Amino acid sequence: MIILIYLFVLVWEEAQGWGFKNGIFHNSIWLEQAAGVYHREARSGKYKLTYAEAKAVCEFEGGRLATYKQLEAARKIGFHVCAAGWMAKGRVGYPIVKPGSNCGFGKTGIIDYGIRLNRSERWDAYCYNPHAKECGGVFTDPKRIFKSPGFPNEYDDNQICYWHIRLKYGQRIHLSFLNFDLEYDPGCLADYVEIYDSYDDVHGFVGRYCGDELPEDIISTGNVMTLKFLSDASVTAGGFQIKYVTVDPASKSSQGKNTSTVSGNKNFLAGRFSHL
C-alpha cells in the first residue's frame, strides 16, 4: 500500500549551483569521496557541540574540521545543509546551494557567521576526511538501489548518513524498502531511518522508522527527497536496502488515493506529511 504525501509540488527554477544541465542534476556524487566534507551533529540533536567537541567528533572519525574553502568546494558540487556548524579555526557557517526563505536568508554560498570568540557556543560540525567510508550521497539516476553501510553485513555503531535524491523537474520519487532490520525501541530513538519530502532534513518530515517491519512505499510530492540513517553506540542489526524509481507526471501510480497503514506499524513515528 502506498502512502501518498500531499504537499504543494516543489517547483524550482533551474540553478547552475545545483550543477543542472537541461533540467537535471547531471552527476551522481558520493559527497564523502568527491569532496571529503560531511556534516555531523551530536547524538542528542542539532546545535549541541562546542568547538572542542566538534573537533573531537571529526578527529575520532579520522578527519578534522573542514576549512571554509573545503566547505565551499563541497557546496559547488551540490553539498547543501540547512544547519550551521563549526569549521576550522573556530568559524561557523553552512553551505546553501538552492536559496530559500526558510534557510540561508534567500542567498546561496556559505552562510558565514564568522570566527566565533565564544568557543563554548553550540553548533553542529563540518568535518573533512577524503578517505571516509562511503555513507550517503547524492543520486540523480532514474532508479537506484542503495544500502546501509556494510550491507548485507551489520552496520557499525555511531553512523550518521544522508542520501539526497534529486530528479528532473516534474518527476516524483517512488521509494520502496527491500530489506529493513534496525535496532528496535518503542520511540525509535536508538537506530533509525528518517525520510524528508525535501532537499534537506529540516523541512517536509515524513516519518522515522526502526525495527524489522518493512515500511510502506512512499511517493514524494516533488523531485527531491532526503533520507537520514543514524545508529547509536550499542546494538547493531542487519541494515537495509532501499530502492527508488522515477514517477513521471503522467504515471498512473502517482494518481491513486491516499491510503495509510501507519496505525498498524509499531515501528514508525509519523511526520505531519505522512498521511491525510
UniProtKB/Swiss-Prot annotation:
Induction of synthesis: By serum and growth factors.
MF term (GO), any: hyaluronic acid binding
Annotated glycan sites: N118, N258
Record has Nucleotidyltransferase as a keyword: no
Organism: Oryctolagus cuniculus
Name of this protein: Tumor necrosis factor-inducible gene 6 protein
E.C. designation(s): 3.1.1.-
Tissues of expression: Vascular smooth muscle cells.
Annotated keywords: Calcium, Cell adhesion, Disulfide bond, Glycoprotein, Hydrolase, Metal-binding, Secreted, Signal
Signal peptide stretch: 1-17
InterPro entries tied to this protein: C-type_lectin-like/link_sf, CTDL_fold, CUB_dom, Link_dom, Sperma_CUB_dom_sf, Spermadhesin-Link_domain
Subunit and interaction comment: Interacts (via Link domain) with inter-alpha-inhibitor (I-alpha-I) component bikunin. Interacts with ITIH2/HC2; this interaction is required for transesterification of the HC to hyaluronan. Interacts (via Link and CUB domains) with ITIH1. Chondroitin sulfate may be required for the stability of the complex. Interacts (via Link domain) with various C-X-C and C-C chemokines including PF4, CXCL8, CXCL11, CXCL12, CCL2, CCL7, CCL19, CCL21, and CCL27; this interaction interferes with chemokine binding to glycosaminoglycans.
UniProt xrefs under PANTHER family: CUBILIN-LIKE PROTEIN, TUMOR NECROSIS FACTOR-INDUCIBLE GENE 6 PROTEIN
Binding site for Ca(2+): E183, D191, D232, S234, V235
Cell location: Secreted
Disulfide feature: C58-C127, C82-C103, C135-C161, C188-C210
EC category: hydrolase
Gene Ontology BP, a term: negative regulation of osteoclast differentiation
Job description of the protein: Major regulator of extracellular matrix organization during tissue remodeling. Catalyzes the transfer of a heavy chain (HC) from inter-alpha-inhibitor (I-alpha-I) complex to hyaluronan. Cleaves the ester bond between the C-terminus of the HC and GalNAc residue of the chondroitin sulfate chain in I-alpha-I complex followed by transesterification of the HC to hyaluronan. In the process, potentiates the antiprotease function of I-alpha-I complex through release of free bikunin.
Residues in Link domain copies: 36-129
Main location: secreted
Keyword Transcription: no
Example of a GO cellular component annotation carried by this entry: extracellular space
Domain CUB: 135-247
Domain notes: The Link domain interacts with various extracellular matrix components, including heparin, heparan sulfates, hyaluronan and I-alpha-I complex. It is required for binding to various chemokines.
